[in-house]
Structures are given as C-alpha cells and as structure tokens.
C-alpha cells in the first residue's frame, strides 16, 4: 500500500473466524532439531503476540490444515503467514514440522510426503552445523531459522498476503526475484488466489494489483523522499513508509512508531483485490480499515479510458476528460460508461505553437518513459522536441543513493491511461495541447 493513496470506504469486507486447532496443549519459543512440531503444540513469540502452528480456516465441512502464523489474541482474520498454501494437510495427527538432516525445515506426513520445506539446501545455504540450528518466532511475527548466529531463512522473505511493520518488501530484481503478495482464494481457503500485489518488473517506482495478468489497480508513481509519513487520527500515530536499498536491491517497508499500536497494524492483499491498511480495535474487538484501495469503480485501472481521469476531489467520484479533451461518446459518458475515453478538442500543430497545460494534484498516467539524470529544462525540451510526446512530469527526488538519480523525468508517447486527480496529494502533469487552448 502506497502512502499517497487516499483513504476511502470499503466495498467488500472480508471477515471470517479461524478455527484454530483446539488441541494446543504446549507452547515454546523455538523449534529445535529432534523436537518436531505436531498438532497440539505451537511456537509462541516472547511477548505472546504471535503463534505458529497448525490451523484450519474452515469452520464446517471437510477441514484442511496448514502451518501458519497468527495473532494469538485476536479471534478473527488473524492469520498473517501460511507455509503450505498449495499443499494442505488433511489429517493433522499424521503431519509434523521438523528439521531435516540438513539445515531445512520440512512439513511432511507419516507417508513421507513432503508438503512444504524451507529449501535452504537447494539454495546452497546449508550449514554443516545444522544440528545446532533453531527456528524462533519473534515479537514482530518473523519466524527465523538460524545456525551459529547466521540467518539461513526467515518468513519475512516469503510473504503470503500480508505485510507486517518492519518487513522489507523487495521491489527490484537485480539478484533476487521480485516479492509479491498473493491473495487467498477465498476467506476459508488460503491457497493462492486471483489477485497479486507487487512492483512493475521494469519500474520499481510504481506498484500494481493484478487480477491474473490484467492490471486491476496501480499505485501513484513514487515522487518523493525516502521516508514518507501520514498521520492517522484514529490510531493517534503516524504510519511511515520507507524506500531503501539492502544488498543492491530496493525495498519498501512501513512502520508505526507507537509501540502500543505497531504490533496490531498490517497491510493486506485481500481476496476481493483490495490493498488494505488495517488495525485491530480492541475496544470493539474488530478490525478497522484505515485505507482500502480501490474504493470507487473509477479507481480501477484504466476505468476512464484514454485521456480520461478519475476525479477523487468531488462529492461524487467520477470520470472526467483531461483539460483540452472531450468524450469520444457523449451518450456513453452521460450513461457513466467511460471506457472509450476522450479525444482532443483541437489537433496538435507540432512546431507551430503547441503548449502544455498544467493539471495539479494528479496521479500521473501509466506507460511512461522514465528518462534519468535530466534537469527540468531538459525534461521539457525532450517532450517539446518530440511531436509524439503527449505529456511530461518532473520531480526532484531523494533517490540518488538508490539509483544514482535525484531527479525523475517522465515522458508519455501516445495515449494517457489510468490517470486520477487526488485529494491534496499528487503532482503536476503537463499535457500537450494546441497552442490556441493554452
């Protein structure tokens, strides 16, 4: 979830109660070699916030069981990580999570079927001192496997549908694969669902929710500093988002400085396709959505068509044409069918006095060309000299330590797709128009 996304109401609530195994008779902080975890036991964080063990999300019918991490003292929507999403256990009494002869953790049944593994050995990270290793569930919800003080594997590197405070989420892929959040299939089935959240493979400055392979929602393009904060009145604290490099990869993360709140705030990719920032309200014993996107139909990807934009500043959020444009089909537009978008009122006259109209507080369009190491004048000249350039946007950044560039020049060639006007946020978008309009 991006800090620049406005707060909206929720269209689809995802609430269910997890039927955790009522067999939990013992608990510890660590999983050790020779001491497997079986149904009836859990690993618990030191402060009691999180637990790891077997659970079933189904409250009726044929139950399937998973190894997961959940909030121990929250009764609903409490699972934040699942190991064996695609390989459930049908008989929990026959399955264990244990160290193998190498340095791996493996979930298997009595028939020897491997249902899930950390797969460290295959990655070449195996330790000859595996018997000295241990896996610990920490107070932040991270399950870490160490050997001789070295981290061999951690659950934070393999998110399912949830980001927790302090978790680094990788948005580049120089030496590692991009990380993604993948929704549950439905509220009672944690197998991989239809919706995926992650960075665009070719541009870490923006992130997408995809429905299958189709863009469903796009974040605003990053145009700011390495740390961005947003005060949330309902929790009386600031949620901050950071952009940072670790081992030559770029990561985003979020945090909450108030200790009493931070362990109960999360970012979730839900099964309806919404990215939510949620907090547990102990006063009413329910989750509260602090942010939820997309909220309106016109917040969905490309909903307003080419050269149209979603205006979030009006009491009724709807599509409009960019300045200097009008609907392609006015009858459809009146009937709130916007997919055909808009066309120019006046044709361009390249080299004969074309100008640029400034639209402020915009989520700039998709499908841009990112030109690096440009001054503002250079960026303007690049667009002006190219008759196919339909718009530009420019920002001074603090990302030089990340990509060697402290500016961001974006150019658009052709149609402008998936544009929005935001409430008190966004940036300037300069749209090329006939000089008579300016």
How should each PLM-predicted stretch be described?
Residues 2-438:
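Beta-rich ligand-binding surfaces for carbohydrates and other polyanions
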């Amino acid at each position: 979830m991006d800090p620049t996304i406005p707060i909206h109401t929720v269209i689809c609530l995802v609430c269910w109660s997890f039927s955790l195994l009522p067999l939990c008779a013992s608990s510890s902080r660590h999983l050790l070699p020779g001491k497997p975890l079986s149904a009836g036991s859990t690993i618990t964080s030191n402060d009691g916030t999180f637990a790891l063990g077997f659970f079933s999300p189904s409250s009726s019918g044929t139950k399937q069981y998973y190894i997961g991490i959940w909030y121990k003292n929250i009764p609903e929507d409490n699972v934040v990580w699942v190991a064996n999403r695609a390989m459930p256990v049908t008989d929990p009494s026959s399955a264990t999570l244990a160290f193998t002869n190498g340095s791996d953790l493996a979930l298997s049944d009595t028939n020897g079927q491997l249902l899930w593994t950390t797969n460290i050995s295959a990655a070449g990270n195996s330790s000859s001192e595996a018997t000295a290793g241990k896996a610990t569930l920490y107070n932040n919800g991270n399950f870490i496997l160490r050997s001789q003080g070295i981290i061999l594997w951690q659950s934070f590197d393999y998110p399912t549908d949830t980001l927790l405070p302090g978790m680094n989420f990788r948005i580049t892929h120089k030496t590692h694969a991009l990380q993604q959040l993948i929704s549950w299939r439905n509220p009672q089935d944690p197998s991989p669902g239809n919706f995926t959240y992650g960075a665009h493979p070719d541009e870490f400055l923006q992130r997408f929710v995809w429905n299958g392979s189709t863009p469903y929602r796009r974040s605003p393009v990053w145009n700011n500093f390495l740390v961005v904060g947003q005060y949330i009145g309902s929790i009386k604290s600031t949620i901050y988002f950071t952009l940072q490099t670790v081992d030559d990869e770029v990561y985003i993360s979020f945090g909450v400085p108030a200790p009493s709140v931070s362990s109960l705030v999360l970012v979730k990719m839900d099964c309806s396709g919404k990215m939510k920032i949620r907090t547990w309200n102990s006063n009413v014993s329910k989750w509260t959505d602090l942010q939820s996107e997309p909220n309106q139909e016109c917040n969905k990807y490309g909903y307003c068509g080419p050269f149209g934009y979603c205006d979030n500043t009006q009491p009724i959020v709807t599509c409009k044409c960019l300045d200097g444009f009008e609907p392609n089909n006015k009858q459809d537009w009146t009937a709130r069918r916007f997919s055909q978008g808009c066309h120019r009122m006046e044709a361009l006259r390249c080299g004969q006095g074309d100008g640029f109209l400034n639209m402020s507080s915009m989520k700039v369009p998709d499908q841009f060309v990112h030109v690096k190491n440009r001054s503002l004048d250079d960026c303007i000249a690049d667009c002006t000299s190219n008759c196919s350039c339909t718009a530009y946007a420019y920002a001074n950044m603090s990302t030089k330590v990340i990509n060697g560039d402290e500016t961001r020049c974006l150019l658009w060639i052709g149609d402008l797709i998936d544009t929005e006007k935001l409430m008190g946020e966004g940036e300037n978008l300069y749209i090329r128009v006939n000089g008579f309009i300016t």
